[in-house]
Every structure is written in C-alpha cells, then in structure tokens.
Amino acid sequence: MGEIFKRTVPDVPLAWTGERLTNSAGPQVEIEHLHRYFVARTLCRGLDVLDIACGEGYGSAFLAQTARSVVGVDVDQATVAHASATYAEPNLRFLEGDARRIPLPDGCVDAVVSFETIEHLYEHDAFLAEVRRVLRPGGRFVVSSPERDVYSPTGAASNPYHVRELTRA
C-alpha cells in the first residue's frame, strides 16, 4: 500500500451533478472519498469487485491495483465513457447501469463497494436486494453514506441530490 494514487483530472471536466466527485467538489470531499477507497482496497485485495455508482472511475482504478477484477457501474453514459477512456487496465471495465438494476449476473462478485450512493436513491430495498443478488455467498459489502446528523445538523438535507439521508438510529 506504499504506492501513491493520483486521481486523473479530465481535460474536459465532468459537470457537477451532485452525484460524483468532480474537481469542483473541493479538497476535503476528495480526501474523504480517497480514504474510503484506501480502506476498500485492503478489504478487496485479490477479489472480484463491483464498484456501484463508480462516478468518473478513479476509485475503481485504485481498487484494480490489488483486486483480481473490478467492474465499475454508473448510471451516466458520459461518465462511463470518460472512465473507460481514462482508466484502461486489463482487469478493469466500466458499464452503464442503475444501482437498482445492476447489469451483471447473479453471484458474480466477491465484493461490492458503494460509496455515497444510497442517499441518492428512494428505493433502498431494491438497491440492497441487487447487492445481495450479485454477491457470491460469503461476499463483502463495503458501503458508506454521509450521516445526516453530521453533514446536515439542522435536519434539512445539505445536498439537494440526497433524497433519503441516513442516521445512526
């Protein structure tokens, strides 16, 4: 884990949609995202991994440094095209797809990684059912979501793209 990872900055920046890390998100957000992928990379070493809502692809590429294989899935076609063109590795591919209807067969991955995704979905049950469907028995689910009480202490969502924020309770 001694190697340094540098996120590739696209020549033409992806537009801020509230649903992926871009250059306009700020350094604190980038540090938090990279930290999550550092943890996931340790947990996913040598495994077949699905990165749901992979965004511009930097995290999937980072996971691919130690995973057997990585599939990054994102709902936005332009983002998938960017990821495919920017992060080309033999054990890494990107697909367009929805977190509630993952375009992969049953039981095809050892680990599912999904960071800052569930709060963008109304259908949490459908998302979690899809994670279960694509995981092999005994698989790992590495997930994070901003805690509403920390990121939105007034109770109102601080990000208009968060449709169902979570709390500890």
Q: What does each model-found stretch correspond to?
A:
Residues D125-R140:
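A short glycine-rich, Lys/Arg-flanked "PGG" loop and its adjoining helix->strand segment in the class I
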Residues A169:
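A SAM-dependent methyltransferase catalytic signature shared across enzymes that methylate proteins
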Residues V70, F141-V143:
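Hydrophobic residues within beta-strands of alpha/beta enzymes
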Residues M1-P105, A111-F115, D125-L128, H162-E165:
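Conserved N-terminal segment of class I S-adenosyl-L-methionine
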Residues E116-H120:
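A short His-aromatic
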Residues V143-H162:
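Short, glycine-/aromatic-enriched active-site segment of Class I SAM-dependent methyltransferases
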